[in-house]
Regions:
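Hydrophobic alpha-helical membrane-embedded or membrane-associated segments
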Residues: 10, 14-18, 409-412
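Catalytic-site microenvironment of enzymes
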Residues: 4, 74, 395-399
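C-terminal segment of classical bacterial N-terminal signal peptides
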Residues: 18-29
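Domain-terminus/edge residues, biased toward the C-terminal soluble/receptor-binding domains
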Residues: 177-178, 189-430
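Bacterial N-terminal signal peptides that target proteins for export
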Residues: 2-12
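Active-site-adjacent loops and short helices of periplasmic peptidoglycan-processing enzymes
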Residues: 27-198, 202-211
Length: 430
């Protein structure tokens, strides 16, 4: 009987532990969802930096302006607040594809891709068995925001969609994203699919380092040639208002970007622009509509170009508010991967980290015996005198040898003569 009681207690204990574990997991999964759903107004945190230019009041729930060179946020309104990204997710899909594939590869569509085709989501009407180049797939991914293409790219690159999603999350962590979790390659709604304006700017910044990525993300038009199952060409034109030349929201210097929308995410927008050698990235999330997102992004770009400049520092440059010089910055030296890195701060705000170039030893100048230390031309007579002195100095040892030999010979002669004289005297007096 005691054995049965002991067994019952054991089973009950295991049951309690199991239920507790389930509750913990559920709570963990619900944390991100709660963070997204419980939206509260957020402030512009960069406005709290002493001496920092006041940033614009954008109407998007969150937004950032990033210096693409340093990765520094020049403006942040809820930059680390979790939101649903929608189709700006495809920026990461594009990045992984160009990093892992040739644009000439053929992509064969399966049920994986075609299942995501619906009348109310972006697509180009691909069919099972249809073949398209990776190049065409990527332009369709960005310009048309085709969800079935995103899913098929994921399967093609990762082997399975899930493995590709794992690649997305691993790459995000490598880039430095701290509040991002992907569950699909398209950005279709899912409670566990989320990111932040800051993290999306980091992903865009990483992508801009890749020439293929940069070319595709900045395309306004592309024509997909007829395929094995479609005799018609598919003509694509950008939906990004700041990139489209005909748009009233077109921004001069726009490099490219990606739009996004779902009812849960609202309108999301990622944009890069370059002027006067400076590239900025803006991200706005949960805007009321695309016009608002574009207006907010334009305000952020204008804020950046009007209020900041580049300051030259040892080994590179950092963005600083107008009127601020290197003398106003604080430098903190540290080591990263065996290299010396200088962190530059303005009123305790990190502006950027610059790797310090290794100092190259300066060779000492060769001493020229004929040169004039006064900087003028050496007189030829002085050169001749110097040469004469060198010849005299060189001849002294030879003369000394000769004199020593003569002196020794004379001494020996004196000794011989002295001995001979002594013998004669002995005979004389003897």
């Amino acid at each position: 009987m005691k054995k049965w009681k002991h067994l019952l207690k054991t089973v009950m204990a295991v049951g309690v532990i199991a239920m507790t574990a389930v509750q913990i997991c559920a709570a963990a999964e619900g944390t991100a969802q709660a963070a997204v759903s419980e939206v509260t107004p957020v402030s512009i945190s960069t406005n709290e930096i002493s001496g920092w230019p006041a940033g614009p009041e954008i109407t998007s729930e969150t937004g950032v302006l990033m210096d693409a060179d340093s990765g520094t946020l020049l403006y942040s309104k809820g930059g680390d607040e979790i939101r649903y990204p929608a189709s700006i997710t495809k920026i990461m899909t594009l990045l992984l594809a160009v990093e892992n594939c040739s644009l000439k590869e053929d992509v064969v569509f399966t049920e994986t891709g075609t299942r995501d085709i619906s009348w109310d989501s972006g697509n180009i009407g691909m069919q099972v068995g249809e073949v398209m180049s990776m190049r065409a797939c990527l332009y369709a991914l960005v310009i048309r925001s085709a969800n079935e293409v995103a899913a098929q790219i994921a399967e093609h690159v990762g082997g399975t969609e899930q493995h590709f999603v794992d690649m997305m999350n691993e790459r995000a962590a490598q880039i430095g994203c701290t509040n991002t979790h992907f569950v699909n390659a398209s950005g279709l709604p899912d409670p566990d699919h989320y990111s932040t304006a800051h993290d999306m700017a980091l992903i865009m910044r990483e992508g801009l380092k890749n020439k293929k990525f940069r070319r595709i993300i900045g395309a306004t038009d592309y024509t997909i040639k007829p395929t094995n199952m479609n005799s018609e060409s598919r003509v694509l034109h950008t939906h990004h208002p700041m990139l489209a030349p005909e748009s009233s929201y077109h921004y001069d210097g726009c490099i490219g970007g990606k739009t996004g929308y779902t009812s849960e995410a609202g309108n999301t927008l990622v944009t890069a622009a370059g002027k006067n050698g400076t590239t900025y990235i803006t991200v706005t999330m949960k805007a009321a509509d695309l016009a608002v997102a574009s207006t907010d992004s334009t305000a952020l770009f204008n804020y950046g170009y009007q209020n900041f400049t580049k300051a030259q520092v040892n080994g590179g440059e950092v963005s600083v508010p107008n009127g601020v010089t290197v003398d106003n910055l604080t430098v903190q030296e540290n080591s990263q991967n065996g290299n010396t890195v200088d962190d530059y701060y303005y009123n305790d705000y990190l502006l950027g980290s610059v790797e310090v170039p290794e100092a190259t030893p300066t060779p000492e100048p060769a001493v020229d015996a004929l040169s004039d230390t006064s900087g003028g031309n050496t007189d030829q007579n002085e050169k001749a005198d110097t040469v004469g002195e060198e010849k005299t100095s060189a001849g002294m040892p030879e003369l000394r040898k000769i004199l020593l030999i003569i002196g020794a010979a004379m001494l020996l002669l004196i000794i011989i003569l002295s001995i001979a004289l002594a013998k004669k005297e002995k005979r004389y007096y003897g």
